Amino acid sequence: MSRRATWLVSRPVEALRQIEEWPAEHVAAGLTSPTAVIAEQGDVGHRLGWGSVTKLLTAYATLIAAEEGALDLDEPAGPEGSTVRHLLAHASGLAWDSPAPLGRPGERRIYSNTGYVVLADHLARRTEMPFGEYLRVGVLEPLGLGATLEGDAAGGIVGTLGDMLAFGREALAPTLIAPETLTEATTVQFPGLEGVLPGFGRQTPNDWGLGFELRSGKSPHWTGTRNSHRTYGHFGSKPGTATFVWIDPERQLAAAAVADASFGGWAAAGWPTLSDALLEEVQQ
């Protein structure tokens, strides 16, 4: 049976057919409002690795722990002078994949997988629960996600497009954290820091919230030009998978896509094109 024959479309949104051209065997994309899926297409039930979209769930678990009083966002964590807030916002000074700091906290926006592993270890100590268990009972199960953590807190989630869209709905209209906590998480932390946005080069500034990457005025970027500057989310890239989820609070929409193909020029060009086409079509 051909891939096209197995695909599901919840309602006709022509823009979603762009994913047929992506260089992947299993690919899916969709759009949701705060309350329900608007459209989805592709291998929507296929599970694959989310890559760094995982960091949004790790950040959400941390925000829940902060609301519960298990930790404080401004308590020390990570290298000397760093806090939980620094780790969440890639401002701790830790390198991409090394425990050795590249700078002082609050000095530069250094995207760091290591920082999220350190954050998860800190969360586990403060909650007295293994990180994976806290994530499961605090985030995955309450949202009804079938996603599972099968690696580290920086990139180990495996799940479906539907799981990602469900998190997008949560990030539009939160049920697990207070609205004011989400507002703080989607507000730039340590304003003015420059840094490299992986795959898209140096950004000045490279705005980031608490886990959520902020679109702001970045160019080039993986979201579309029709996305509002208030858009937030994350993309993921690891060998054999490329994923994204964005949440646009001005449009009251979230979109996600998953593909079992490594990130490359097809994604850097195709994701913004898809995003713009979705926004143009759905909001006509």
Predicted regions and their residues:
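N-terminal core-entry segment
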Residues: 25, 31, 85, 101-102
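Active-site helix/loop module of the DD-peptidase/beta-lactamase fold
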Residues: 49-53, 57, 65-101, 111, ...
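Solvent-exposed loop/turn segments at secondary-structure junctions
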Residues: 94-95, 116, 261-263
